[in-house]
C-alpha cells in the first residue's frame, strides 16, 4: 500500500517491537487513528501521536522500548500537545503499567493487550481530559470483529485466526500476557481472506500463537485448522497461503492431508 501524505492532517507514528502478531496489531492501531483523521508518518519529530506497541518475550525488546520512550522526554517537553501511548505485551505484565507511569510520567495512555480494540475510546477520552489514561484488563474478552486496519505490507497481508495460548511452556510468557486461546469464526476469517484477494493481495499469512489448535474453543467439530485452510484454498484468485506459529502436539493427520492437497 502506498500512503499519500496530506499536510492538513494530523500525523501518527507507531513503533513496533516483537512478532508478526504485533506488526498486524500495529496496522489495527494505525487503522483506528486513520479512521479518526490521522495519517501515518515515518518520523516521531512531526507526529501528533506516538504509539509504542511493545514486546516482552525478550528482555532486549523491553530495554529498547524503554530507551526509546525515555528519548521522547525532550520532544514531549517541546510539544505539550503530543500524545504518547504505550501498549502491547510489555504493559500487560503484572505491575508493569504502574512502573512505566512512574518511570515515564509524560506517557499519556497505557493500554494492555486485551484493550487494543478499545484504543479509539481511550484516545478520545485523553483528548477530552488532561488525566493520564491507564487501562489494562487482566481477563481476556471475546473476539471483537470490525477493527479498521491500515495495511502496510502489500502485497502481503496478515490475518489473525486465534488470540492467546493455552500452552504454558516453561520458558514462555505468552499465555500470561495474551490470555487464553480464542478463535475467530471460520466465516469471518474466510470473508476477510476473500476481500484481501479481491483487493489484489498475493500472500496471506494466518496468525496465531498456535494456529494448529484453531477452533478447539468453539463447539463445532467442523471448525478446525485443517478445514479452515482447505476452505481458504478453494477461494478464487492467485495467492499463496502461509501460517505461523504452530505447536507440534496439535499437528494431526487431517492437517497433513489438507496441506498436501
Predicted regions and their residues:
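Proteins enriched for Cys/Gly/acidic motifs involved in redox and nucleic-acid/cofactor modification
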Residues: 2-214, 254
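Conserved SAM/AdoMet-binding glycine-rich loop
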Residues: 81-86, 95, 198-261
Amino acid at each position: 500500500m502506498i500512503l499519500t501524505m496530506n499536510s492538513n492532517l494530523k500525523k501518527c507514528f507507531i513503533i513496533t517491537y516483537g512478532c508478526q502478531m504485533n506488526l498486524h496489531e500495529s496496522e489495527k492501531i494505525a487503522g483506528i487513528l486513520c479512521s479518526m483523521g490521522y495519517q501515518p508518518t515515518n518520523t516521531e519529530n512531526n507526529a501528533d501521536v506516538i504509539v509504542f506497541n511493545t514486546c516482552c518475550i525478550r528482555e532486549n525488546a523491553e530495554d529498547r522500548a524503554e530507551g526509546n520512550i525515555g528519548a521522547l522526554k525532550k520532544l514531549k517537553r517541546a510539544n505539550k500537545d503530543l500524545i504518547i501511548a504505550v501498549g502491547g505485551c510489555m504493559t500487560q505484565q503484572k505491575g508493569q503499567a504502574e512502573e512505566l507511569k512512574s518511570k515515564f510520567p509524560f506517557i499519556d495512555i497505557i493500554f494492555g493487550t486485551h484493550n487494543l480494540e478499545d484504543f479509539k475510546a481511550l484516545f478520545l477520552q485523553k483528548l477530552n481530559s488532561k488525566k493520564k489514561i491507564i487501562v489494562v484488563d487482566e481477563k481476556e474478552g471475546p473476539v471483537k470483529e470490525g477493527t479498521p486496519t491500515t495495511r502496510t505490507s502489500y502485497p502481503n497481508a496478515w490475518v489473525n485466526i486465534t488470540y492467546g495460548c493455552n500452552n504454558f511452556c516453561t520458558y514462555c510468557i505468552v499465555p500470561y500476557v495474551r490470555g487464553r486461546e480464542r478463535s475467530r469464526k471460520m466465516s469471518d476469517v474466510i470473508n476477510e481472506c476473500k476481500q484481501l484477494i479481491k483487493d489484489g493481495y498475493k500472500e496471506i499469512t494466518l496468525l496465531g500463537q498456535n494456529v494448529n489448535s484453531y477452533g478447539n474453543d468453539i463447539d463445532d467439530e467442523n471448525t478446525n485448522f485443517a478445514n479452515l485452510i482447505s476452505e481458504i484454498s478453494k477461494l478464487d484468485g492467485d495467492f499463496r497461503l502461509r501460517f505461523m506459529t504452530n505447536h507440534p502436539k496439535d499437528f494431526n493427520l487431517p492437517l497433513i492431508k489438507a496441506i498436501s492437497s
